[in-house]
Structures are given as C-alpha cells and as structure tokens.
UniProtKB/Swiss-Prot annotation:
UniProt-listed Enzyme Commission number(s): 1.15.1.1
Protein name (Swiss-Prot/TrEMBL): Superoxide dismutase [Cu-Zn] 1
Keywords of the record: Antioxidant, Copper, Disulfide bond, Metal-binding, Oxidoreductase, Periplasm, Signal, Zinc
InterPro entries xrefs: SOD-like_Cu/Zn_dom_sf (IPR036423), SOD_Cu/Zn_/chaperone (IPR024134), SOD_Cu/Zn_BS (IPR018152), SOD_Cu_Zn_dom (IPR001424)
Main enzyme class: oxidoreductase
Cofactor details (free text): Binds 1 copper ion per subunit.
Subcellular location: Periplasm
Signal peptide extent: 1-20
TM stretches of this protein: none
Entry-linked CDD domains: Cu-Zn_Superoxide_Dismutase
Amino acid sequence: MKYTILSLVAGALISCSAMAENTLTVKMNDALSSGTGENIGEITVSETPYGLLFTPHLNGLTPGIHGFHVHTNPSCMPGMKDGKEVPALMAGGHLDPEKTGKHLGPYNDKGHLGDLPGLVVNADGTATYPLLAPRLKSLSELKGHSLMIHKGGDNYSDKPAPLGGGGARFACGVIEK
C-alpha cells in the first residue's frame, strides 16, 4: 500500500513538472512614456496540440476588445518617434519572421506571426478569457520577444488603417529567453 501511494505521488509530481515545462508566465505592466508602469497582472502561455493558449489574469483595464500581439523585441521601454516619447516603442513591431509586412490576424498564415486574437476585457476591467493562437506552436517561438496590448480593437487588416487600426500601446510584458 505504501509503495502504491508513493508511486502515485511520484507520478503526479513528474506530470506536474512536465506540465510546468510547457508553460511560461509573462508579467504585464502599464506602458508609459516615462517607462514601465504598475503591474496589471500576468499572462500564462501553454503549449497545446492546437497552438499556444494565452490565459490572461489581468486587471485595471478599459472594458472592451483590445489588440493583442507578440512584438519583435524583448523590451517595454519607451522610444522617440516624430519628436515624441512613445510608450513601449522599443518592443518594435509585430513579430514577422517571414517579413510579410502584412497584418492579417491570427488565422491567416500569410501575415505577421505575432498577430493574436483580440483580448476581451470584462466590464469590471479584468481579462480572464483564454485565447488560442493556432499559428504559434512552441513556447520557444515567443522567447526573446514581448507581449503587447493596444487600446481599442483590431480588424486583422491593414485597411482602412495599418496594423488593424488599433490604438496606442498601453500594456507590455517581456518574454525572457
């Protein structure tokens, strides 16, 4: 009996450690023109057979749907553009390793790899709905980049406005290597 229980516990621990290897957690902070702001929560990313699953645990956000992307650089620092300090500009653009130059959303393989489904924020300012990114298969594809939340929605097109017509960068998290 002792050995059976010990075997079950050991098996459970091995399973948990294997699951931990297939997830990563990204701390998200307000993106400010003066630098990184307050922590607003975290996003857990898990590998699934269907793509990467992004599970937000965020608060203090504006209700509605917001553009959500993987950006090229592992930075959330501001940068200068047209003489103005822009929040999280050092994160670069949407992850686009194939250099498509097209914003076509998470389901079209001819656009940015970093285009993710829209982030849904509840009326109370929390975001908890998981998002599936079917084109991203491995956590290694994310490492050394950043996650970005934009003000406003995303139409998954470059028309009528570039990059889905989303607004300013307002939350960012660096994905460590």
